[in-house]
């Protein structure tokens, strides 16, 4: 029987079970992640975050993310902020800005004295092969809008990879958007070979949007950091939002602040909070 210490955290209600694999032995491939994610019979969370040491010179930590269904993903923005807060609170680093290795590249979270965390999320990708996405409507590479073929018709989406794949849909009223219905159709769609996160974006002004996200392997969540980044990038490319300005992204769980200038890195700022400490036994 194995005993494991963990911390429950959240970023705007997007909640995580965070495991320190620096100070204790833990192999996620051997863990019953889906059972732990169960909100009635387990710890309950959207994603499991594993904090490890990196073997790459100049990199402080390795960051692994597992969805509630046990599948591993390459990036999670809200998780990145919680990761940074966790390693600081646990005394694993005394740096204000850390270098973190993920499955899809390196990120640079920075902690502020006011409790907010800013993360350089890197450059967005748009080519269908980078999403990945399979166009079926004759669109060229790097198009701002692609068509997803549903039984009800063709759904226009903007495709952005922010370390994980996103399809962004512009809606008039996010409160009335068919997030679960349409999200559950697009998330596993054949045109997205690795499945996709589906964002529903309402543009409020040139520097403000409202957003709901149906996450891959999870369903709708209270907040999605990479989803907020993808939505702002898509809005700028579509001419709906101002480039180089800080855009306020209001999600069900709270507000994130995203900034992007074309060709540059995406910057995300938001809170990260610990909820409780726990310990469990598993075989």
Curated annotation (Swiss-Prot):
Signal peptide: none annotated. Keywords: Amino-acid biosynthesis, Cytoplasm, Isomerase, Lysine biosynthesis. Substrate binds at residues 14, 47, 67, 77-78, 164, 197, 215-216, 225-226. It catalyses: (2S,6S)-2,6-diaminopimelate = meso-2,6-diaminopimelate. It comes from Neisseria meningitidis serogroup B (strain ATCC BAA-335 / MC58). NCBIfam families: DapF. This is Diaminopimelate epimerase. One of its GO terms (cellular component) is cytosol. The record marks 166, 215 as: Could be important to modulate the pK values of the two catalytic cysteine residues.
């Amino acid at each position: 029987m194995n005993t494991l210490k963990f911390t429950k955290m959240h970023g705007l209600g997007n909640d995580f079970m965070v495991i320190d694999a620096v100070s204790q032995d833990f192999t996620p491939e051997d863990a019953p992640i889906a059972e732990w994610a169960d909100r009635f019979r387990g710890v309950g969370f959207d994603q499991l975050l594993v904090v490890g040491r990196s073997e790459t010179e100049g990199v402080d930590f390795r960051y692994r993310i597992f969805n509630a269904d046990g599948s591993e993903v390459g990036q999670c923005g809200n998780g990145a902020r919680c990761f940074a807060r966790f390693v600081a609170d646990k005394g694993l680093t005394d740096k204000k800005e850390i270098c973190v290795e993920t499955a899809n590249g390196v990120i640079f979270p920075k902690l502020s004295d006011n409790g907010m965390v800013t993360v350089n999320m890197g450059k967005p990708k748009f080519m269908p092969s980078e999403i990945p996405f399979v166009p079926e409507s004759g669109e060229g590479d790097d198009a701002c809008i692609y068509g997803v073929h549903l039984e009800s018709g063709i759904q226009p989406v903007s495709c952005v990879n922010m370390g994980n794949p996103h399809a962004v849909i512009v809606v008039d009223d996010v409160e009335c958007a068919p997030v679960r219905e349409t999200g559950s159709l697009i998330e596993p769609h054949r045109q997205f070979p690795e499945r996709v996160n589906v964002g529903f974006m309402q543009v409020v002004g040139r520097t403000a949007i409202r957003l709901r996200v149906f996450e891959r392997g999870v369903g709708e969540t209270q907040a999605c950091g990479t989803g907020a980044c993808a939505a702002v990038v898509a809005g700028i490319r579509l001419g709906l939002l101002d480039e180089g300005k800080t855009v306020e992204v209001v999600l069900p769980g709270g507000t994130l602040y995203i900034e992007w200038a074309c060709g540059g890195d995406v910057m995300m700022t938001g809170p990260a909070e610990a909820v409780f400490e726990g310990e469990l036994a598993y075989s």
